[in-house]
């Protein structure tokens, strides 16, 4: 079997330096951008927000907020909370890392990360991660479906950072397991069948179909290896290629991001990618910086590999 190999680089530049900031939203931090094309035209951007002390929504804890845009460039903050976290006894006592998609029934769906304090196999308290589902007619007002997905093949049944797509009338979810990306499929978007590890190393992925090719952006270590007890803060962005959105080439491309001054963006500031193709056919990837103070977007400066 082929092993993952870095075969080259692909160049991106910062498009919008500040899509929004944590202080504009009155939050302590904002991370995990997820974007969707609206049926009515334009785009919505969803974010995980950790409430600040002077929160505009009088909220606390970790919730999901949104912004709206007609062009993908100028963004307006939408008041209120899209997904409010549950109680300390709920699977989503923190509600974060949104992944938004349009269902076959033309409703909007969200697969977000629910975190709660649970007890691990050793009997110790530990934060647990599950993928939780919600539905909306308009993308603004959401109802929780009281459904969640966990992966018993992972330690603590860990599953987070979901990214969901429709491929050939089937829902495909990519999510983060134990520092890898796992694929599951569903015919109704509610009952999921775990398929296999799609990417053997990495976390926080986003997939997009662009110019008839499927691309996945994944955060990975530069060496494509995690030594024991390794941290992820120096991980960088890689680009993976697929012709069907299911089978991924083991030839990986390192994404080089330069800011408007031509300086390379630091690894720590490249986190939680969320990709979208705008109506003019151009690609954008949204990211948050270290500490979740800023959301910014990037665009390719060269043709992507096929």
Over which residues does each language-model region extend?
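Carbohydrate-active catalytic/glycan-binding domains of CAZyme proteins
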Residues: 1-306
């Amino acid at each position: 079997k082929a092993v993952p190999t870095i075969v080259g680089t692909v160049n991106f530049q910062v498009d919008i330096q500040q899509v929004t900031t944590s202080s504009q939203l009155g939050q302590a931090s904002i991370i995990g951008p997820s974007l969707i094309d609206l049926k009515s035209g334009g785009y919505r951007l969803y974010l995980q927000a950790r409430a600040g002390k002077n929160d505009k929504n009088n909220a606390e804890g970790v919730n999901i907020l949104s912004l709206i845009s007609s062009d993908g460039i100028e963004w307006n903050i939408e008041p209120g909370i899209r997904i409010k976290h549950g109680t300390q006894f709920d699977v989503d006592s923190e509600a974060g890392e949104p992944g938004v998609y349009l269902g076959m029934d033309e409703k909007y769906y969200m697969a977000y990360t629910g975190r709660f304090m649970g007890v691990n196999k050793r009997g110790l308290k530990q934060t647990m991660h599950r993928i939780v589902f919600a539905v909306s007619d308009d993308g603004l007002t959401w109802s929780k479906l009281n459904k969640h997905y966990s992966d018993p093949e992972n330690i603590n049944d860990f599953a987070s950072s979901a990214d969901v797509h429709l491929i050939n009338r089937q829902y495909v979810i990519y999510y983060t397991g134990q520092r890898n990306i796992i694929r599951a499929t569903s015919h109704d978007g509610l009952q999921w069948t775990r398929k296999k590890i799609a990417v053997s190393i990495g976390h926080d992925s986003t997939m997009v179909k662009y110019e008839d090719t499927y691309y996945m952006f994944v955060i990975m270590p530069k060496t494509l290896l995690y030594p024991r007890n390794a941290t992820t803060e120096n991980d960088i962005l890689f680009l993976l290629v697929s012709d069907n959105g299911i089978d991924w080439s083991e030839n990986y491309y390192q994404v080089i991001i330069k800011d408007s001054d031509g300086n390379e963006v630091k690894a720590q500031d490249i986190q939680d990618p969320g990709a979208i193709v705008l109506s003019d056919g151009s690609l954008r990837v949204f990211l948050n910086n270290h500490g979740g103070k800023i959301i910014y977007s990037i665009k390719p400066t060269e043709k992507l590999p096929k």
